C-alpha cells in the first residue's frame, strides 16, 4: 500500500498493517514516517497494541536521537528516526508476540549500527505467531552470513526457553557491523543433504519430546538417511513460566541454503478444547518442511524480505537472488522499499537452459530477483 501523502521528507501511511516494515525502513533511510488511523474503527481496543509499543521502545534503545509522538488514543504515531547506535542493551519483550518478532528488526538493522550489537531479549522464545529463535538461527543467520562474508561476532544463543503465554525465556543476540554489504549473485539452491532439528519440552514429561522426535523422523527418513534431531529438555527456572513443547527442523542443501519449519503445542487454555498430540506435531512440522523445500529458492520463504533488503542496500552492482514464490509479506516489502529508497526490482521466472538444470530446480515456480544496489554506506560506523 503506497503512502497516502508525503510532507517534505516524511511519509504518511494509514492503518496498522506492516508497521514493523515501515519502522525498519525509516531507521535505515532516515526518513520520518507518520502512521494514522491505527485500528481506529476497533471500538474495544483502538490504537497500537502492547507488542507494537514494545517494538518502538526497542528501536528507540538501539538508536540515538529518535523522536516518537503518540496521540492519547494511540491511533496515530509519528516516528522520526535517529542514528543507529547499537551497543549493549537489554529489553523485556511483550509476551503477546514471540521474541522472533523483535529479532527480525535487530537482524535487519544490526549490520548498520555504530557499535556491534549485543542484545539480551526476554520473553516468549517459541510461539505460533512469530518465527521461533531456532528458526531464525537456522534460516535468517545463514542468509546474513552470505552478505557479511566473515561471520565473526555473529551469534544467537538461547539462555533459557519460555513458551506462550507467559514466556520467561531469554536469548542473547550478537551482530557485527559492516561499512557496506557486498553485491551477491546467488542462483543455485543445491540438493538437500541433511536435516537437523531441535525438540524442546518445558515443564512437561520428556516422553512428549521423544514421541515428537519419532513422528518427525518417521516422515523424513523416507527421503534421506541423514536426519538428527536434538532433544532439549528443560527443568525449573530454565523452562520458563508456561508448560509446552515444540519442534524446529532445518534442511541444509549442498550449496549452504537452509530451509526451516517449526511448530509448537497449544497453550494450556487452548489445550482444554484441542489438546496437542506429539505424533501429530511431529508429522505436521515434517510436512511443513517438505512444503518449504518444494517452494525452493536460495532462502527460506519467511526471510525473502530480508534477502530483498540486503541486495537493495548492497554495493552499486547488479545483484541476483533466486527465491521461491514470493509471499504476500515480501510483495508489500518490495513496495515499501520503493517508497523509502526509490528502488525497484526486476522479477522474472528463470528458465532452465538444459534438462540437467531443469531437474535441479524441480518444484514450485521460482522467482529471480534482480536489482542494482543503492550503495548504502554505514555512516554510523567508526573509521580508523
From Swiss-Prot:
CDD domains: RNA_Cyclase_Class_I. GO terms for biological process: endonucleolytic cleavage of tricistronic rRNA transcript (SSU-rRNA, 5.8S rRNA, LSU-rRNA); ribosomal small subunit biogenesis. Keywords: Nucleus, Ribosome biogenesis. Part of the small subunit (SSU) processome, composed of more than 70 proteins and the RNA chaperone small nucleolar RNA (snoRNA) U3. InterPro entries: RNA3'-term_phos_cycl_insert (IPR013791), RNA3'_phos_cyclase_dom (IPR023797), RNA3'_phos_cyclase_dom_sf (IPR037136), RNA3'_term_phos_cyc (IPR000228), RNA3'_term_phos_cyc_type_2 (IPR016443), RNA3'_term_phos_cycl-like_CS (IPR020719), RNA3'P_cycl/enolpyr_Trfase_a/b (IPR013792), RPTC_insert (IPR036553). Part of the small subunit (SSU) processome, first precursor of the small eukaryotic ribosomal subunit. During the assembly of the SSU processome in the nucleolus, many ribosome biogenesis factors, an RNA chaperone and ribosomal proteins associate with the nascent pre-rRNA and work in concert to generate RNA folding, modifications, rearrangements and cleavage as well as targeted degradation of pre-ribosomal RNA by the RNA exosome. Does not have cyclase activity. This is Probable RNA 3'-terminal phosphate cyclase-like protein. GO terms for cellular component: nucleolus; small-subunit processome. It is found in: Nucleus, Nucleolus. It comes from Drosophila melanogaster (Fruit fly). Its main location: nucleus. Belongs to the RNA 3'-terminal cyclase family. Type 2 subfamily. One of its GO terms (molecular function) is RNA endonuclease activity. Pfam families: RTC, RTC_insert.
Amino acid at each position: 500500500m503506497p503512502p497516502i501523502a508525503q510532507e517534505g521528507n516524511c511519509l504518511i501511511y494509514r492503518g496498522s498493517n506492516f508497521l514493523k516494515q515501515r519502522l525498519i525502513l525509516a531507521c535505515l533511510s532516515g526518513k520520518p514516517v507518520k502512521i494514522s488511523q491505527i485500528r481506529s474503527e476497533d471500538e474495544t481496543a483502538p490504537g497500537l497494541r502492547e507488542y507494537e509499543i514494545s517494538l518502538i521502545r526497542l528501536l528507540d534503545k538501539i538508536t540515538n536521537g529518535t523522536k516518537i509522538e503518540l496521540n492519547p488514543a494511540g491511533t496515530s504515531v509519528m516516528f522520526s528516526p535517529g542514528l543507529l547506535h547499537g551497543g549493549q542493551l537489554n529489553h523485556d519483550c511483550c509476551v503477546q508476540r514471540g521474541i522472533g518478532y523483535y529479532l527480525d528488526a535487530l537482524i535487519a538493522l544490526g549490520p548498520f549500527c555504530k557499535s556491534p550489537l549485543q542484545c539480551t531479549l526476554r520473553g516468549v522464545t517459541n510461539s505460533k505467531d512469530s518465527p521461533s529463535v531456532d528458526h531464525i538461527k537456522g534460516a535468517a543467520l545463514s542468509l546474513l552470513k552470505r552478505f557479511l562474508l566473515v561471520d565473526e561476532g555473529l551469534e544467537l544463543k538461547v539462555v533459557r526457553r519460555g513458551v506462550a503465554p507467559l514466556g520467561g525465556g531469554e536469548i542473547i543476540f550478537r551482530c557485527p557491523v559492516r561499512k557496506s554489504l557486498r553485491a551477491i549473485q546467488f542462483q543455485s539452491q543445491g540438493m538437500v543433504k541433511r536435516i537437523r532439528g531441535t525438540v524442546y519440552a518445558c515443564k512437561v514429561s520428556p516422553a512428549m519430546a521423544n514421541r515428537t522426535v519419532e513422528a518427525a523422523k518417521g516422515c523424513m527418513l523416507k527421503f534421506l538417511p541423514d536426519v538428527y534431531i536434538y532433544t532439549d529438555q528443560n527443568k525449573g527456572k530454565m523452562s520458563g513460566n508456561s508448560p509446552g513443547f515444540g519442534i524446529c527442523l532445518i534442511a541444509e542443501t549442498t550449496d549452504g541454503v537452509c530451509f526451516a519449519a517449526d511448530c509448537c503445542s497449544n497453550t494450556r487454555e487452548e489445550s482444554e478444547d484441542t489438546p496437542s498430540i506429539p505424533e501429530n506435531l511431529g508429522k505436521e512440522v515434517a510436512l511443513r518442511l517438505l512444503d518449504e523445500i518444494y517452494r525452493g529458492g536460495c532462502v527460506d520463504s519467511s526471510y525473502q524480505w530480508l534477502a530483498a533488503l540486503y541486495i537493495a542496500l548492497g554495493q552499486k552492482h547488479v545483484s541476483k537472488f533466486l527465491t521461491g514464490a514470493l509471499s504476500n509479506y515480501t510483495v508489500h516489502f518490495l513496495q515499501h522499499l520503493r517508497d523509502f529508497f526509490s528502488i525497484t526490482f526486476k522479477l522474472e521466472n528463470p528458465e532452465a537452459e538444459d534438462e540437467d538444470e531443469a531437474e535441479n530446480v524441480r518444484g514450485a515456480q521460482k522467482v529471480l530477483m534482480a536489482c542494482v544496489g543503492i550503495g548504502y554506506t554505514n555512516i554510523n560506523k567508526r573509521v580508523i
